[in-house]
UniProtKB/Swiss-Prot annotation:
A Pfam match: DNA_primase_S
Stated name of the protein: DNA primase small subunit PriS
Organism: Halobacterium salinarum (strain ATCC 700922 / JCM 11081 / NRC-1)
Cofactor(s) needed for function: Mg(2+); Mn(2+)
Any one GO molecular-function label of the UniProt entry: metal ion binding
GO CC annotation: DNA-directed RNA polymerase complex; primosome complex
Matching SUPFAM superfamilies: Prim-pol domain
Biological processes, Gene Ontology terms: DNA replication, synthesis of primer
Length: 391
């Protein structure tokens, strides 16, 4: 990034911060703070181990430093400004989740557009919230658009505040569906009947919640589809499953047709051949419904995370706290564009042609010097695809 570009962005970030109203996280004085300035060179060095006492008021700090990125710690400490983690004396931490398009299995880097990546990341966010709200019962969630290519979720609950890294890793494993298998998911239920010397058991997926609910929902749709197809078409479909021949396929179809209610309730012991189907649907459910969060962010109790209301130095977009009810309608490429950058044109220079999708419009510019809306120019300069041209 050229010095002219860096100076321009620093100045305009400062203009945003002079108008901004920043809401600090709870217990802000007990948290570590850090920031990345607009320094020259390819490497970005974070200034960290700061407390609010070191920075002064957040408003004056942002106006004075105009930082490229601003962070606060998930953890709270007795001495947040101490130079080492041992000296800080950890008290507890928010439970933080990070979803980034770079880590999503459904995103194809180099092929998906920025807008497509954000859309897929939002889908993953909704799946994560389903886990946190329905499975864990968390009520107080703070959802934030990262300003880049993803979202952050903070859980501030007394029940998770003092969890260590290993306990947090168990939560990661759950929402990612790590190592989820039929044998660990099913629950044994006794089979009733008078006069049984040796009572038997049947294995059931717990359909009332958790991963069992998700798998059972898909098995319900599978059973309905199989019956609707009819035997011959259903057998042809089932033989496409690994390890299922025609004989097993007919057995599966017949057992589903004859025991539809049991299958929909999650009974996987209706027939030995049905176990193959159940295992397949567990794998499919995990692939479709897991939340591919970034594990190190959640397990690191000292993690620094972006400050809502600040700007992301790699995009010029706002790190924006989101109301849960408004999440469905939120479009980051429209709603996170700072108003300070709207209504002005600037000149930028690009080495190659580049397309930007912002504020509901698609703009193709370059190569060479072009006049563009400032919000588009800031976005391209921050992402390193353009430099500031002389006006």
């Amino acid at each position: 990034m050229e010095e002219r570009t860096r100076a321009y962005l620093r100045g305009r970030f400062g203009d945003v911060y002079r108008r901004a109203e920043i809401d600090l996280p709870p217990r802000a004085d007990d948290r570590e703070w850090g920031y990345i300035p607009w320094t020259a060179g390819p490497d970005t060095t974070m200034v960290r181990h700061k407390s609010t006492l070191d920075l002064g008021s957040m408003t004056s700090f942002l106006e004075r430093k105009c930082p490229r990125h601003v962070y606060f710690s998930a953890g709270t400490y007795d001495a947040p400004g101490a130079a080492t983690m041992d000296e800080k004396h950890w008290q507890g931490s928010d439970l933080v989740f990070d979803l980034d398009a770079d880590h999503l299995p459904r995103v194809t880097l180099g092929e998906d557009s920025y807008a497509e990546m954000l859309s897929k990341c939002k889908d993953a966010l909704l799946r994560l919230l389903d886990f946190l709200e329905r499975d864990f019962g968390f009520e107080e969630l703070t959802v934030t658009f990262s300003g880049g290519r993803g979202y952050h979720v903070h859980v501030r609950d007394a029940g998770v505040y003092e969890l260590g890294s290993e306990e947090r890793r168990e939560i990661v494993d759950y929402v990612r569906g790590n190592d989820l298998a039929l044998e660990t998911l099913v629950e044994a239920e006794p089979v009733g009947g008078r006069g049984l010397e040796n009572p038997t058991e049947k294995r059931m997926l717990p359909a009332d919640g958790g991963w069992g609910r998700r798998v059972t929902t898909r098995l319900e749709a599978f059973a309905d589809d199989l019956i609707e197809r009819g035997e011959d078409d259903a057998v042809a479909t089932l033989t496409e499953f690994d390890g299922v021949g025609e004989r097993s396929a007919r057995a599966i179809y017949n057992v589903v047709a004859d025991n539809t209610t049991a299958v929909k309730r999650g009974n996987v012991d209706v027939h030995p051949a049905f176990l193959t189907v159940a295992r397949r649907y567990i794998d499919e459910t995990v692939a479709a419904e897991q939340a591919p969060i970034d594990e190190p962010v959640t397990t690191d109790t000292n993690r620094l995370i972006r400050l809502p209301g600040s700007l992301h130095g790699g995009s010029g977009l706002e790190v924006q706290r989101l109301d849960r009810a408004a999440l469905d309608d939120f479009d980051p490429l429209v709603d996170a564009v700072p108003e300070t950058f709207v209504g002005h044109d600037i000149t930028v220079e690009l080495p190659t042609e580049h397309t930007v999708e912002l504020r509901g419009e698609s703009l193709t510019v370059g190569p060479g010097v072009s006049t563009v809306p400032e919000y588009a120019g800031v976005f391209m300069m921050a992402r390193g695809t353009a430099e500031k041209a002389t006006e």
